[in-house]
Amino acid sequence: KRMGLEYVDIFYSHRVDENTPMEETASALAHAVQSGKALYVGISSYSPERTQKMVELLREWKIPLLIHQPSYNLLNRWVDKSGLLDTLQNNGVGCIAFTPLAQGLLTGKYLNGIPQDSRMHREGNKVRGLTPKMLTEANLNSLRLLHEMAQQRGQSMAQMALSWLLKDERVTSVLIGASRAEQLEENVQALNNLTFSTEELAQIDQHIADGELNLWQASSDK
């Protein structure tokens, strides 16, 4: 009613609720589809094990799990480490990565400090997830290396970060935010080069440290 819609395309369980049995969550998701309030259902920030269980619970209702929305980017690779993409592929579930640009870190905006016109400067430690304390020397070193790699590829850092995600056929799409049309146009150009050399991938794996940016780690670790 508040949205003024008769139904939504996708209804998400946005993260694990330890106080609610998964059977109850699955039932609520299934009811949303069966009552015509949602066309499909998805989950977000679920571990591979919880994802598998949700797939099986929804099957009992004859409802497919359409999509998983994990936080995933070059500085936040819990999806790789956990094997989540394999779980999704094995069950025919799509993946839409949110925070693909690490809330702006992977745009190059913070390479030389915190700009005065940035959200981090305006809100400081109030920002959900991205705070000044995350501009560690390790993260800054990773950003500098990524910036150099992007230049060598003829891309902006943001474009390369999106390309890195979309090169994997198991990643259906990425969820980006843009405050200006120019940002959207720049991001879309990431599709022009989704190919990475073996050397580039090895360099990323060896030298880019995990930035500890998993926004809902408490959920995805369960």
Labelled PLM ranges:
Residues 20-206:
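Beta/alpha (TIM)-barrel catalytic core signal, keyed to glycine-rich beta->alpha loops juxtaposed to Asp/Glu
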Residues 210-214:
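Amphipathic, coiled-coil-like alpha-helical segments
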Residues 216-221:
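Short coil/turn segments at secondary-structure boundaries
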Residues 1-20:
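Active-site groove signature of glycoside hydrolases
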